[in-house]
Every structure is written in C-alpha cells, then in structure tokens.
Amino acid sequence: MIWDTDSIIQAYAQGYFLMSDEEGTLGWYTSSQRTLIPLDDRFRYPKSLQRVLNQERFTVAINRDFPAVCWGCANRETTWISHELIEIYLQLNQAGWAFSFETWQGNQLAGGILGIAIRGAFIGESMFYNIPDGSKVAMVKLVEHLRARGFVLFDAQLQNPHLARFGSYGISDREYKLLLRKALSSKCHLI
C-alpha cells in the first residue's frame, strides 16, 4: 500500500505519531505528556558510557542500512512497529524524511536510532542495539549531531527508564506544540 507522504509529514508536524496496536492495526496517536531529549546542557549520560566513547570502538553513519535499523527496532517480543509501518518508514526514507542514525563496529551494525526529521525537529521513533552500548553511543552522537545542525527539538514521544538516563524530561502537549512550531520555523537538515 502506498501512503500519502505529505499527509504523514503534515500529521507529524502537528504532533501526531504512528503506532500499531497489538493486532497490528496502524493508527495515529498523541500524548498529553511528551518526552524530549534535551539538546542543551541538561543532556547527560552515565560515566561508564564516557569510557566507551573514549575507546572509539564505534563509527557513526546515517542511512548506511536504513532497512536493517527498521527491522532491528521492530525485532522485539512486543513491538508497535508493524510490517506496514516499516513500509511507511521506507517510503519516508526514500522521500528524504526518515533517517537512521547508526553505530557500526567494523562491518557490523551495532545499533541505531530511527527517526523523522522535519526542519528543526527530530522525532525519534525507536532505537535498538545488536552490540552492547551501540544504541547508547548512537544517542550521544545523534545529540551532538543535532546540536551542530541547529535542531531545536528531539522528540522521544514516550518516557522510559532508558531515556531517563540521558536526562529526558516531559512537557505538556501545549508546551510541546509551541516548541514544535518553533522547530518547524527553523531551516535545519540532518544531512
């Protein structure tokens, strides 16, 4: 099935995001409380991760293997990423909206973050790892990249304990929409 890319991006630009339910039915969602990854000095990570970063075991790439990142994010016991949603991500990637921010160890995909970039907003859809610390390093390097590119917003959608380790925080839907509007007025490009 071909989805209308413009309509999908327009919905994301209004604060909605796609998820599949337990039966695989795709739907649009929003949240009264939105989770953000800080792009300022509130961003933090464990000291043990600094040692991993200093070892430079991982290299970073964008869209080197976008489909593998999609499947890596979906490959869980319970997942909200259906086959149909992967097809949408692939379509958005072809149109220049969806990206994978990846870490590699040699020729092996270590981890990655799947997201949608609309001007100054990066909407993180999911992340995964194949090698320990792969997704954590991807998070640090993605935040550095977004800062360098002038991004205003890193939307993580829903809070979880893993994101809290990076200083993630919640804001109201009203605050989110104001920040999203500001981000959409910025002219940023992920690549």
Curated annotation (Swiss-Prot):
Keywords: Acyltransferase, Cytoplasm, Transferase. One of its GO terms (biological process) is protein catabolic process. The keyword Transferase applies. Its EC number is 2.3.2.6. SUPFAM superfamilies: Acyl-CoA N-acyltransferases (Nat) (SSF55729). GO terms for cellular component: cytoplasm. It catalyses: N-terminal L-lysyl-[protein] + L-leucyl-tRNA(Leu) = N-terminal L-leucyl-L-lysyl-[protein] + tRNA(Leu) + H(+); N-terminal L-arginyl-[protein] + L-leucyl-tRNA(Leu) = N-terminal L-leucyl-L-arginyl-[protein] + tRNA(Leu) + H(+); L-phenylalanyl-tRNA(Phe) + an N-terminal L-alpha-aminoacyl-[protein] = an N-terminal L-phenylalanyl-L-alpha-aminoacyl-[protein] + tRNA(Phe). Pfam families: Leu_Phe_trans. It is found in: Cytoplasm. GO terms for molecular function: leucyl-tRNA--protein transferase activity. It is an enzyme of class 2 (transferase). It comes from the Bacteria. Belongs to the L/F-transferase family. NCBIfam families: aat. Functions in the N-end rule pathway of protein degradation where it conjugates Leu, Phe and, less efficiently, Met from aminoacyl-tRNAs to the N-termini of proteins containing an N-terminal arginine or lysine. HAMAP family: Leu_Phe_trans. This is Leucyl/phenylalanyl-tRNA--protein transferase. It comes from Gloeothece citriformis (strain PCC 7424) (Cyanothece sp. (strain PCC 7424)). The lineage of its organism: Bacteria, Bacillati, Cyanobacteriota, Cyanophyceae, Oscillatoriophycideae.
